[in-house]
Amino acid sequence: MLIKQFSRRSKNMKVQILLAFAALFVLAVGSYASESKKLDLRDALFSAMFSADYQLNPQERGCRYFLGECKKTSECCEHLACHDKHKWCAWDWTIGK
């Protein structure tokens, strides 16, 4: 009789542990999906901010302003240089005339 009670408790405990792991798995998947959506939104916002060169054509203003898209430094305004990796105009660390 003692063995039957132990066996029944053991099965009950196994089911509880299995349910706990299943619940943790569901929470982990939900958290990962939520974080993935946040990262996608953040990437979209950054790309929209840094490609906001649509406001004026470079022909109208003569040069590209800070964080404007560029291919070479000569396209950027004074005190700005075309960043090699990101291809936008960044400050070239010079001050004055």
Swiss-Prot record:
* Pro-sequence residue ranges: 34-61
Q: Which domain of life does this protein belong to?
A: Eukaryota
How is expression of this protein distributed across tissues? Expressed by the venom gland.
- InterPro entries per record: Huwentoxin-1, Huwentoxin_CS1
- What Gene Ontology terms describe what this protein does at the molecular function level? ion channel inhibitor activity; toxin activity
Write out the entry's keywords from A to Z: Disulfide bond, Ion channel impairing toxin, Knottin, Secreted, Signal, Toxin
**For this UniProt entry, what is the primary localization, expressed as one broad class?**
secreted
| Keyword match Signal | yes
Q: Does the keyword Cell cycle apply?
A: no
What is one term from the GO cellular component aspect held by the record? extracellular region
Pfam families annotated for this entry? Toxin_12
Where is it localised?
Answer: Secreted
Q: Signal sequence span per UniProt?
A: 1-33
> Which cysteines link up through disulfide bonds?
C63-C77, C70-C82, C76-C89
Write out the similarity annotation: Belongs to the neurotoxin 10 (Hwtx-1) family. 12 (Hntx-12) subfamily.
Q: What does this protein do?
A: Ion channel inhibitor.
| Free-text domain note | The presence of a 'disulfide through disulfide knot' structurally defines this protein as a knottin.
The name under which this protein is listed is U6-theraphotoxin-Hhn1a 1
Organism, per UniProt? Cyriopagopus hainanus (Chinese bird spider)
